Curated annotation (Swiss-Prot):
This is Chaperone SurA. Keywords: Chaperone, Isomerase, Periplasm, Repeat, Rotamase, Signal. One of its GO terms (biological process) is protein folding. It is found in: Periplasm. GO terms for molecular function: peptide binding; peptidyl-prolyl cis-trans isomerase activity; unfolded protein binding. The PPIase activity resides only in the second parvulin domain. The N-terminal region and the C-terminal tail are necessary and sufficient for the chaperone activity of SurA. The PPIase activity is dispensable for SurA to function as a chaperone. The N-terminal region and the C-terminal tail are also required for porin recognition. Chaperone involved in the correct folding and assembly of outer membrane proteins. Recognizes specific patterns of aromatic residues and the orientation of their side chains, which are found more frequently in integral outer membrane proteins. May act in both early periplasmic and late outer membrane-associated steps of protein maturation. It comes from Burkholderia pseudomallei (strain 1710b). Gene3D superfamilies: 3.10.50.40, Porin chaperone SurA, peptide-binding domain (1.10.4030.10). PROSITE patterns: PPIC_PPIASE_2. Residues 185-288, 301-399 form the PpiC domain. The gene is surA.
Length: 448
């Protein structure tokens, strides 16, 4: 059941992406928008259009989600501008995917929806009911799942598959983490405001962007300024709706100019000068520092002692039969049944004779679906049925410990970190080039 660790390019994060980009709203919300502007064309994207109805659906959903999260909702014009820009980028990518012959069949979509339901501890019909209760028609949610899968395949083809990481880069990365200051290295949580100005743009356009960025910098430096609100309303980055929050980043994953700029800042301070990056200008605020969480900065890894019960599909059992049997077994275990005895009796894995015990597992030694589920469990907790390429599993975590990582494991972690950083930058560059080479006309006046 274990597998060899291998480098995989950055995944698209389907669950988060679906939640973020699903454009559907309830019929009641649609009626509230009014019919007069519903079918007005708000943007032309090559040979396609985006209508006012589509834009209002997306804006309404995002606004409601922000309200549910008790997060500030940007002014309507600003939110519409940001959402319309996201929709334009999405539409351009869908067109490119179709031109490339990328298709996603129904079986793949259904399997993905099943995994989403499983990740939420539900069966598919329960998950469907939950989505619809949130005001999102199921057929549109399925359509968005198909679109996200298509864009993920497009990114893999056009960007991720072309990312390479040399042994020299790995060695350099590890050396930087093992340097004299490695023990005291800190991760940085940053917020930023981005103003687009590609290096190959006309100088006049760069000057205009710089002037705008300088004005925003002065606002950010002003006493009492709300950096998060300013980022939500003015940043041209995709993370603007999150207030420009980049989360915690290791210094090795950030541009050196950014690391140098924030090195002298105290938490809460804004860097007093603009930072020129290849595609624009950055205004950066240091939110906080913490001890490095980067696995490559430490020889320690976390191992998990785990056992499981595996039921294979196709050996006299259908998908639903295997899943239901494990649900019944889990219920008995939670009522005091012996996991080990159930594993010896029912598991179809080679570990059955050991009561399902897989021993101590290091990161990357199991298939991703198994590892993700395992990592969410507390000691002693038993998972819901988890689907992998092998069948359905019940997983129980018995304990965790810190262990010395092998040289190969450290190299794998470093290679993954470098690959992720390079893939994100390459994707950003590719997306910008795709946007610049497309015909886009905004028909509805929106704030910029």
């Amino acid at each position: 059941m274990k597998k060899t660790l291998r480098f995989a390019a950055v995944a698209s994060g389907l669950v988060a992406s679906l939640i973020t980009v699903a454009p559907s709203a309830s019929a009641q919300a649609l009626r509230a928008q009014g019919a007069s502007l519903a079918d007005e064309v708000v943007a032309v994207v090559n040979n396609d259009v985006i209508t006012g109805r589509e834009l209002d659906q997306r804006v309404g959903l995002i606004a409601r989600r922000l309200q549910q999260q008790k997060a500030p909702v940007p002014p309507t014009d600003q939110l519409r501008a940001q959402v319309l820009n996201q929709m334009v980028l999405e539409r351009i990518q869908v067109q490119r995917a179709k031109d490339d012959g990328i298709v996603v069949d129904n079986a793949t979509v259904q399997a993905t929806l099943g995994r989403l339901a499983q990740a939420n501890g539900m069966q598919l019909d329960q998950y469907k009911a939950r989505i619809e209760a949130q005001g999102v028609p199921w057929d549109l949610f399925v359509r968005d799942a198909r679109t996200e899968l298509m864009l993920s395949k497009l990114r893999e083809k056009e960007v991720d598959s072309k990312i390479t990481v040399s042994d020299a880069e790995v060695a350099s990365y590890i050396a930087s983490q093992r340097g004299p200051n490695a023990g005291s290295q800190q991760d940085l949580r940053l917020e930023h405001i981005f103003v687009k100005a590609p290096a190959n743009a006309p100088q006049a356009d760069i000057d205009v962007a710089q002037k705008k960025a300088e004005g925003l910098l002065q606002q950010a430096l002003a006493s009492g300024a709300n950096f998060e609100r300013l980022a939500k309303n003015q940043s041209e980055a995709d993370d603007a709706k999150k207030g420009g929050d980049l989360g915690f980043k290791s210094p090795a994953s950030l541009p050196s100019d950014v690391v140098d700029a924030v090195s002298k800042l105290r938490p809460g301070e804004v860097n007093p000068t603009l930072i020129r990056v290849p595609d624009g200008f950055e205004i950066v605020r240091l939110v906080e520092r913490r001890a490095s969480q980067n696995p490559a900065a430490s020889p320690k890894i976390v191992q998990t002692h785990v056992r499981h019960i595996l039921l294979r599909v196709g050996e006299g059992k259908s998908e639903s039969q295997a899943r239901q049997q494990l649900i019944d077994i889990r219920r008995q275990i939670e009522s005091g049944g012996d996991f080990e005895k159930f594993a010896r009796t029912y598991s179809q894995d080679g570990s059955a004779s050991q009561g399902g015990d897989l021993g101590w597992i290091s990161p990357g030694e199991t298939v991703p679906e198994f590892e993700r589920a395992m990592n969410t469990l507390q000691d002693g907790q038993v998972s819901n049925p988890v689907r992998t390429e092998y069948g359905y599993h019940l997983i129980q975590v018995l304990g965790r410990r810190d262990a010395e990582g092998s040289v190969q494991q450290q190299m794998d972690i470093a290679r993954q970190a470098i690959g992720q950083r390079k893939a994100e930058q390459a994707y950003s560059d590719w997306l910008r080039e795709l946007r610049d080479s497309s015909y886009v006309q905004i028909k509805l006046p929106v704030a910029q």
